[in-house]
């Protein structure tokens, strides 16, 4: 019998009590010779990306047990950022990532599980489970709930998503009837919101990290093909257990799959597909858990050489995740990157000996396997539903046009510089992040006048009250991991700037973060944050700020001497907002803030404080 971790709680006379309890869960004599595989589910009726997951854990469990494992399912929490947005609920979103990671670690270690299947989907759940998997370093397979179908309405000639509903709601020229129509049409099915927002970005990145199956990030939640991903995950995790525990093959462990090279691959993909800036935060956090020295400097280096090969909503209205899938999904983007010499193809995945082998099998422009071609023809049915695997619609053709299609070749890239950039300067000494895919080229270099707000709420009020003018740089500070606390998303301020016609004539800088739905010159993750003594806390109304994306710089046009004077004054006052905010900060949030690092460290806990 292999030397399973679970033997700690299943073997030996002194474990009679534990075995009695295992038996009470349904285990038989023969089960104590099998690997115990945890299924970390995240079903909840609060979140459309998770509302359909209730029965999927047991679907995986049956497949695990059919192939020789013992499956034990548990649940963790899931916060819907869209529902939590615009009020104090957003303070809990990023901290929930740490709770999710902890809860998975607690359950798996407390019960000595041998492996995990992580059933995630939305914004903080995939990152939280990824952090846990890399902490635990036992065999794992990720399988997410899948993306939502894009919405449709006669009032628009393009697919709709959540951001469209938010933008029209903030546009005074839109009638109540139009707003209501968009609201009812934007989110028609279960699944993670239909554009390249944070949830879908992260689920795509698990493919590049090598920890999930091909199609995980792009196969629609409603499509029957997605069921096969769950079944394959159940079979695969048993195989990984056999390889590790039975054969001593450590190459299957998460830290050996998600190596430094794999993190570079994931970030390269993120840049190429114009993913959410939140993915940077989460990859940095995951790298910390894997004990990898992967940081913003590495991301900056990659951002300078990786072109943008895919453009999806919110960066363009024409394409949503269903279109990415039709174009071959993530492995077609990885294939183009590989042909451009931009990908490490020698790294393993949980399903293939190497990324090169996986690309050869799954890239629609390389493979001749008709089953693969059929798989990527899976499309939307256009029928509102909250039921997984409820339709089997297929496109007649694939989108394999690498010159003008959804996915482009390196030679025909949307732009030769990728969709994300890291900026440094005296206002963000440790860096800040911008999603260049959503920035109009006319404002890649922008000098503006600082307009200071010390909370997201006050910024929203100011924008809606027309206090922000063309040429302003809206600065929202004390919204970082420690200062918020919780590093709120700033989707409402950016959406309202857009609805006011200021999207191409203003910028926004914050130590908070942005939704994957953000577009415009929106710069987040300013590090160090204001609450940690960052220079963003020294900016005054009327100061000039120069943003230079091509040169990767952002600077407050104030002398070093003046900044030193301001810093001394701020040290005396304390690094906190001038006016108290009407914000209830619970004990749980205060505990999070106490240990939170700035965004350049992934906003993870400060281990130095824990180690004393």
From Swiss-Prot:
What are the binding positions for [2Fe-2S] cluster in this chain? 122, 193
Catalyzed reactions = (2R)-2,3-dihydroxy-3-methylbutanoate = 3-methyl-2-oxobutanoate + H2O; (2R,3R)-2,3-dihydroxy-3-methylpentanoate = (S)-3-methyl-2-oxopentanoate + H2O
Entries under InterPro entries matching the protein = Dihydro-acid_dehy_C (IPR042096), DihydroxyA_deHydtase (IPR004404), DiOHA_6PGluconate_deHydtase_CS (IPR020558), ILV_EDD_C (IPR056740), ILV_EDD_N (IPR000581), IlvD/EDD_N (IPR037237)
Under Gene3D superfamilies, the record lists: IlvD/EDD C-terminal domain-like
Q: Name one GO molecular function term.
A: magnesium ion binding
Gene Ontology biological process terms in this record = isoleucine biosynthetic process; L-valine biosynthetic process
List the pathway annotation.
Amino-acid biosynthesis; L-isoleucine biosynthesis; L-isoleucine from 2-oxobutanoate: step 3/4; Amino-acid biosynthesis; L-valine biosynthesis; L-valine from pyruvate: step 3/4
Q: What is its EC number?
A: 4.2.1.9
Keywords, sorted A to Z: 2Fe-2S, Amino-acid biosynthesis, Branched-chain amino acid biosynthesis, Iron, Iron-sulfur, Lyase, Magnesium, Metal-binding
GO cellular component terms, alphabetically, are: cytosol
Q: Which cofactor does it need?
A: [2Fe-2S] cluster; Mg(2+)
Task: Name the domain of life this protein comes from.
Answer: Bacteria
Question: What are the catalytic residues?
Answer: 515
Binding positions (Mg(2+)): 81, 123-124, 489
Which residues are reported to carry the modification N6-carboxylysine?
A: 124
What note does UniProt attach to the cofactor annotation?
A: Binds 1 [2Fe-2S] cluster per subunit. This cluster acts as a Lewis acid cofactor.
Q: Which HAMAP family match?
A: IlvD
Subunit info?
A: Homodimer.
Please describe what this protein does. Answer: Functions in the biosynthesis of branched-chain amino acids. Catalyzes the dehydration of (2R,3R)-2,3-dihydroxy-3-methylpentanoate (2,3-dihydroxy-3-methylvalerate) into 2-oxo-3-methylpentanoate (2-oxo-3-methylvalerate) and of (2R)-2,3-dihydroxy-3-methylbutanoate (2,3-dihydroxyisovalerate) into 2-oxo-3-methylbutanoate (2-oxoisovalerate), the penultimate precursor to L-isoleucine and L-valine, respectively.
Q: Which family does it belong to?
A: Belongs to the IlvD/Edd family.
Q: Supply the name of the protein.
A: Dihydroxy-acid dehydratase
Q: Which organism is it from?
A: Ectopseudomonas mendocina (strain ymp)
UniProt gene name: ilvD
């Amino acid at each position: 019998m292999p030397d399973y971790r679970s033997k700690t709680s299943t073997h030996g006379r002194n474990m009679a009590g534990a075995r009695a309890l295992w038996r009470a869960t349904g285990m038989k004599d023969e089960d104590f010779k099998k690997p115990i595989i945890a299924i970390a589910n995240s079903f909840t009726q609060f979140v459309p990306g998770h509302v359909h997951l209730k029965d999927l854990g047991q679907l995986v469990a049956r497949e695990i047990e059919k192939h020789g494992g013992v499956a034990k399912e548990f649940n963790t929490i899931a916060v819907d950022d869209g529902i939590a947005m615009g009020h104090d609920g957003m303070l809990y979103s990023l901290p929930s990532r740490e709770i999710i990671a902890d809860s998975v670690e607690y359950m798996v270690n407390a019960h000595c599980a041998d492996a995990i299947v992580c059933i995630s989907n939305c914004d903080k759940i995939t990152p939280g489970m990824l952090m846990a998997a890399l902490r635990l370093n036992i065999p794992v397979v990720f399988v997410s709930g899948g993306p939502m179908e894009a919405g449709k309405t006669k009032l628009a000639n393009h697919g709709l998503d959540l951001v469209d509903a938010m933008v029209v709601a903030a546009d005074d020229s839109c009638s109540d009837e139009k707003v209501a129509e968009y609201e009812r049409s934007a989110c028609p099915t279960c699944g993670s919101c239909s554009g390249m927002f944070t949830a879908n970005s992260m689920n795509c990145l698990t493919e590049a990290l090598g920890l999930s199956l091909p199609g995980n990030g792009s196969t629609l939640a409603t499509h029957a093909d997605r069921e096969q991903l769950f079944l394959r995950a159940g079979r695969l995790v048993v195989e990984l257990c056999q390889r590790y525990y039975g054969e001593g093959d450590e190459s299957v462990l998460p830290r050996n799959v998600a190596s430094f090279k794999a993190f570079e691959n994931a970030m390269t993909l993120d840049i190429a597909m114009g993913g959410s800036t939140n993915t940077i935060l989460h990859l940095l956090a995951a790298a910390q858990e894997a004990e990898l020295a992967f940081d913003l400097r590495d991301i900056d280096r990659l951002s300078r050489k990786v072109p943008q090969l895919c453009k999806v909503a919110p960066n363009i209205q024409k394409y949503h995740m269903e279109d990415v899938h039709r174009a071959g999904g993530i492995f077609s983007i990885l294939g183009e990157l590989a042909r451009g010499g931009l990908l490490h193809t020698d790294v393993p995945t949980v399903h293939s000996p190497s990324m090169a082998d996986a690309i050869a099998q799954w890239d629609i422009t390389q493979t001749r396997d008709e089953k693969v071609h059929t798989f990527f023809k899976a499309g939307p049915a256009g029928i509102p539903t909250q039921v997984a695997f409820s339709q089997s619609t297929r496109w007649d053709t694939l989108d394999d046009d690498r010159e003008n299609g959804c996915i482009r070749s390196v030679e025909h890239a949307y732009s030769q510089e990728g969709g994300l950039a890291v900026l440094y300067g005296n206002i963000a000494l440790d860096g800040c992040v911008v999603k260049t895919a959503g920035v109009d080229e006319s404002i890649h270099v922008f000098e503006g006048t600082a307009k200071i707000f010390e909370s997201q709420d006050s910024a929203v009020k100011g924008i809606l009250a027309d206090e922000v003018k063309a040429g302003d740089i809206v600065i929202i500070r004390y919204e970082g991991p420690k200062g918020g606390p919780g590093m709120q998303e700033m989707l409402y301020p950016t959406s309202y700037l857009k609805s006011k016609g200021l999207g191409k004539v203003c910028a926004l800088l914050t130590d908070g973060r942005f939704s994957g739905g953000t577009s415009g010159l929106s710069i987040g993750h300013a590090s160090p944050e204001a609450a940690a003594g960052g220079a963003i806390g020294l900016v005054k109304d009327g100061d000039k700020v120069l943003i230079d994306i091509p040169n990767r710089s952002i600077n407050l046009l104030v002398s070093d001497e003046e900044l030193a004077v301001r810093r001394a004054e701020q040290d005396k006052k304390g690094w906190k907002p001038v006016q108290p905010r009407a914000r209830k900060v619970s004990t749980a949030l205060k505990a999070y803030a106490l240990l939170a690092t700035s965004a350049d460290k992934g906003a993870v806990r400060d281990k130095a404080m824990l180690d004393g």
